[in-house]
Amino acid sequence: MKTKFIKRIAAAGMAVACMVATTISAFALEGRSNWNENGYSVDMKVYTDYLTGYAEADSNYTIEEMRLDGVVSNPYSHAYLYAYGENTYYISDSAKLQYGVDKVEANYYFYTSEGYEHSQYVNAGK
């Protein structure tokens, strides 16, 4: 008798957990941007979860790495990753945050070694 009761509680708990997981995913946004040229690839990803305030911004290829590889020639080239919420936070090329974040955006701007101007932008949030 006691075992049946415990099994029913466990089953009900699992059903609630599944509903909560589905609801939470509805409050998260992800944005991606990819650039490929001459064998080089920049893949930027931003993610914002409204319920937890967790935000993540990441790039597989930082501006500093691009300079070292000779892809970027202009010293004014930059990568901006920002998180917006109660305050605005500047993030480095790769970061994870847990604040009251509403939106994350990433912006790459550089001149390639061939002299081409490139700008890449992605965001996720309100």
How would you label these PLM feature ranges?
Residues 1-47:
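N-terminal prepro-regions of secreted/extracellular proteins
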Residues 29-126:
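Mature secreted bioactive peptide module from preproproteins
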